[in-house]
Amino acid sequence: QFHSLRNLIVSLNLEAAELLELTQWKSDAEVEAIPADPKLAEDLRDECADILLLLLLVAEKAGIDLIAAAQAKLRKNEHKYPVEKAYGSRAKYTELG
């Protein structure tokens, strides 16, 4: 009952929020220093692992091959953001012209 697709997606987002919380109210420099701090690095690893494990459960429950999905998404992005138009730009694909 607790591993419904909906509950897994909610849990995945809650774990992502915990990852985000590690950076809350910190400067970019403080965030970049997290991996050098043993306690914070462990917290970062734990949150990343929680997210990965839940993502795997979501994908399994939904019948998604994550490798194939990632490859397909990269191909879509190549079409949306062609290098010759998008390189060095923060523009959304609809604004690249």
Predicted segments with their positions:
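Flexible "arm" and connector segments at domain edges
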Residues: 1-48, 52-97
